[in-house]
Regions:
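N-terminal ordered "arm"
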Residues: 8-57
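Short, well-ordered strand-loop elements centered on a beta-strand within folded domains, enriched
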Residues: 16, 39-46, 60, 79-87, ...
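Short, intrinsically disordered, low-complexity segments enriched in Ser/Thr and Pro
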Residues: 48-73
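Basic/polar N-terminal segments that are highly enriched at the extreme N-terminus
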Residues: 1-14, 212-215
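Extended hydrophobic/Leu-rich segments
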Residues: 1, 52, 93-96
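Internal, well-folded beta-alpha domain core
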Residues: 64-215
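A short linear-motif detector with a strong N-terminal bias
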Residues: 4-6, 13, 26-30, 63-67, ...
Length: 215
């Protein structure tokens, strides 16, 4: 369905998130989008995990919950017409917790981070799915999956001569999402749904710890 503006007149409560962040996309290593805005192959597809270490939406606690954002844009992100699908852990049982996560990650709750900005580039937003999300947080060796839907495994770069694991980091003092991230690559990165169906294994990945607040 087409994304429409929220008609709610309810005041947005103060919110805060601190999360492990695992980003994977279809760009070559390092992802040129973060430097000049244009993807390696002219389009952008990404699967991103947020493992919330601590968080709240007003009085609603969000600690320990997982959210995956799946995006696809036909061109660069800022050229719009994108598609978004949220996958939220089944562990978010209460309706108010689910609504809080949807408000934040859809951009309706405004605030810091990519959510509100990305929302302006999305033409189609799919109904959120509440699913089992399997998560392993281990820096540049993190992984996450949703059974029968997506599978992501991240791995470090390795020196081809010595076999030594590389310590690769990117620093962006004015970065929108992160200021410092560990650069990695995907051993596996795929999603299979009727709307989003791609396999971009062997491409770019980042691991970071991010912190946002709003509104």
């Amino acid at each position: 369905m087409e994304l429409s503006s929220s008609s709610s007149t309810t005041q947005i409560p103060p919110w805060h998130l601190k999360a492990d962040y695992v980003e994977t996309c279809n760009c070559d290593y390092g992802c040129p989008c973060i430097f000049d805005g244009f993807p390696t192959y002219g389009f952008c597809r990404t699967l991103i995990l947020y493992h919330i270490r601590e968080g709240n939406y007003g009085d609603i606690k969000l600690d320990g919950l997982d959210v995956v954002t799946a995006y696809s844009w036909p061109k660069a992100i800022h050229e719009a017409n994108g598609t978004m699908h949220l996958y939220i852990t089944k562990n978010a049982i209460e309706d108010n917790v689910r609504h809080a996560l949807i408000d934040i990650f859809s951009g309706n709750a405004k605030g810091e981070g990519p959510f509100a900005l990305f929302a302006q580039t999305i033409k189609y937003i799919l109904e959120p799915h509440f699913v089992d999300i399997n998560v392993k947080i281990d820096g540049k060796k993190s992984s996450f999956s949703v059974p029968n839907i997506m599978d992501v495994q991240v791995e470090s770069f390795v020196n081809p001569v010595t076999g030594e694991e590389q310590d690769t980091r990117i620093q962006l003092p004015k970065g929108l999402i992160w200021k410092l991230a560990e650069a990695a690559k995907t051993k596996l990165m795929r999603i299979t749904t009727p709307t989003l169906n791609f396999d971009d294994s062997g491409k770019n990945a980042f691991y970071s710890v991010v912190e946002f607040k709003g509104p």
